[in-house]
């Protein structure tokens, strides 16, 4: 796609790393545009002040470095976990759910600064380009979007390094060769892809895992915690109320120490190819188990099964980048309605990579001791009623059987 030539000012999603620093300078030299940078603190665990200083060094006048951790967990992660969203049976969507938040801030900053375009550093092979751009267009249909990886003429890492040297962009010594794999991280998870991970038959090296210790190295004694919920959202750990971001960070610590949340998967990208990734979602893995457990005693069977039926579609919408679509918002309204009575506390045992639910309690529980007891239920349930229930449900099966036996 040809570069827009009428761009005067562009907001760049800027990490401060080599690639986005090269993109920054490329936007200045190729488009002659004024560049505004946006760096988000999503809980990736990196000091962000160097990104500000690097942007200043590259001549940027308008620099936005924002702590969005609470917004990320409260408005994006928690709504997603109310749905128990999992893509292709295993992926907890840690990268996918961060992209609409970044796009939202890019659009807001573009409006604030009078920019007519935004830019991102996603490659032309991945899902992130789609997620960034669908989200941006949903919020501003007239915004111009620049994706340098699809447009520039660099063919190799050497070309990038030569450009960096030509424009006096600092290059760390460990960046002069190919990185062994690429990493994306936020408060929910970290993902590692590419290079040493491209052969799906070969086990990932241990050094790839940065958020969790190996289950083999985890403590020999289990850790027991209690997670409290209110209207479907986790609100406390061991009775202590916490903000959304603090709660998730605390669960991450418990998960990391017990080797929880590792995932090696091959997923189907939206753009059509399969990719292998090594993901770590320690806190999210605990949160999902706890949320399903509290739902098990507070959700009606019909509501629970309907949620499970809809979940794959909801997860797919997030994975594909349709967070701001009307269908995702419609599903969210239904999901949020289901969470009105999802409150209580879940007890979990964490041990060597495993999350085991050992207890759940709620004032809104639908679990009845009187109904399920093996002892005298004092008339709460008349077992004779089951005969008619079974006969009615068997009617169509018996009718089919009679027809088939008479062939």
Swiss-Prot record:
PROSITE patterns: ARGININOSUCCIN_SYN_1 (PS00564), ARGININOSUCCIN_SYN_2 (PS00565). Keywords: Amino-acid biosynthesis, Arginine biosynthesis, ATP-binding, Cytoplasm, Ligase, Nucleotide-binding. InterPro entries: Arginosuc_syn_C, Arginosuc_syn_N, Arginosuc_synth, Arginosuc_synth_CS, Arginosuc_synth_type_1_subfam, AS_cat/multimer_dom_body, Rossmann-like_a/b/a_fold. Pathway: Amino-acid biosynthesis; L-arginine biosynthesis; L-arginine from L-ornithine and carbamoyl phosphate: step 2/3. Its EC number is 6.3.4.5. L-citrulline binds at residues 91, 96, 127, 131, 182, 191, 267, 279. ATP binds at residues 13-21, 40, 121. It is an enzyme of class 6 (ligase). SUPFAM superfamilies: Adenine nucleotide alpha hydrolases-like (SSF52402), Argininosuccinate synthetase, C-terminal domain (SSF69864). It catalyses: L-citrulline + L-aspartate + ATP = 2-(N(omega)-L-arginino)succinate + AMP + diphosphate + H(+). One of its GO terms (biological process) is argininosuccinate metabolic process. Its main location: cytoplasm. One of its GO terms (molecular function) is argininosuccinate synthase activity. It holds the Pfam family Arginosuc_synth. L-aspartate binds at residues 123, 127-128. One of its GO terms (cellular component) is cytoplasm. Homotetramer. This is Argininosuccinate synthase. It comes from Agrobacterium fabrum (strain C58 / ATCC 33970) (Agrobacterium tumefaciens (strain C58)). The gene is argG.
